[in-house]
């Protein structure tokens, strides 16, 4: 990766990590993301599965819905929305899960950069490689995907989350540890 691109990648991932920290503060799994168009952040998202009581409200889905809503409000047709997604780049703190990786493929996103791998549900190489696209993936398109950007920072947030416990986990669950907010 070129030096300027590397610096930009760290800046964009920093924005995604900020979203992940907001998720952590809200007692959500700390995943955050930002979508870019022409090098500008146009949407951001964080996990909201507990808050919404909806297991599909991952950071990527939150940001995708934000973009689709804005573009529909702007009067863009479905083909224009598809064209916009084909020019977008996503930075996300953790490898997209199978659901999100599939959605990104369906939307035809250009590129995805992520922090740490998702060894349980990863859809960009850890479990499945949905970013490669295939004839079997109906209407799915391939996209460039690269991981390992600020992975230690992303893993650190996960450690904080799992050390404090998840009060929204099904019972019985281990006790929640109260920690000071910083």
From Swiss-Prot:
The keyword Transmembrane does not apply. One of its GO terms (biological process) is tRNA wobble adenosine to inosine editing. InterPro entries: APOBEC/CMP_deaminase_Zn-bd (IPR016192), CMP_dCMP_dom (IPR002125), Cytidine_deaminase-like (IPR016193), tRNA_aden_deaminase (IPR028883). One of its GO terms (molecular function) is tRNA-specific adenosine-34 deaminase activity. Keywords: Cytoplasm, Hydrolase, Metal-binding, Nucleus, tRNA processing, Zinc. It catalyses: adenosine(34) in tRNA + H2O + H(+) = inosine(34) in tRNA + NH4(+). Its EC number is 3.5.4.33. It comes from the Eukaryota. It holds the Pfam family MafB19-deam. It is found in: Nucleus; Cytoplasm. Zn(2+) binds at residues 58, 97, 100. GO terms for cellular component: cytoplasm; nucleus. Disruption phenotype: Embryonic lethality due to embryo development arrest at the globular stage. The keyword Ion transport does not apply. Residues 7-135 form the CMP/dCMP-type deaminase domain. Its main location: nucleus. Involved in RNA editing. Catalyzes the specific deamination of adenosine-34 in several cytosolic tRNA species. Generates inosine at the wobble position of the anticodon loop. Belongs to the cytidine and deoxycytidylate deaminase family. ADAT2 subfamily. This is tRNA-specific adenosine deaminase TAD2. The lineage of its organism: Eukaryota, Viridiplantae, Streptophyta, Embryophyta, Tracheophyta.
């Amino acid at each position: 990766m070129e030096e300027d691109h590397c610096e930009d990648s760290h800046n964009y991932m920093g924005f995604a990590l900020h979203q992940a920290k907001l998720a952590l503060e809200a007692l959500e799994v700390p995943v955050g993301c930002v979508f870019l168009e022409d090098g500008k952040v146009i949407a951001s998202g964080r996990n909201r599965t507990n808050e919404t009581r909806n297991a599909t409200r991952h950071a990527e889905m939150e940001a995708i819905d934000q973009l689709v809503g804005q573009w529909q409000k702007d009067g863009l047709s479905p083909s224009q929305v598809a064209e916009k997604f084909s020019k977008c780049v996503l930075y996300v703190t953790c490898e997209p899960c199978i659901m999100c990786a599939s959605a990104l493929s369906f939307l035809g996103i250009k590129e995805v950069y992520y922090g740490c791998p998702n060894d349980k549900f990863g859809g960009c190489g850890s479990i499945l490689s949905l970013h490669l696209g295939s004839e079997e993936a109906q209407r799915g398109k391939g996209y460039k995907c690269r991981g390992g950007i600020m992975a230690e920072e992303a893993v650190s947030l996960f450690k904080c989350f799992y050390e404090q416990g998840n009060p929204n986990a099904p019972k019985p669950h281990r006790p929640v540890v109260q920690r000071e907010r910083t």
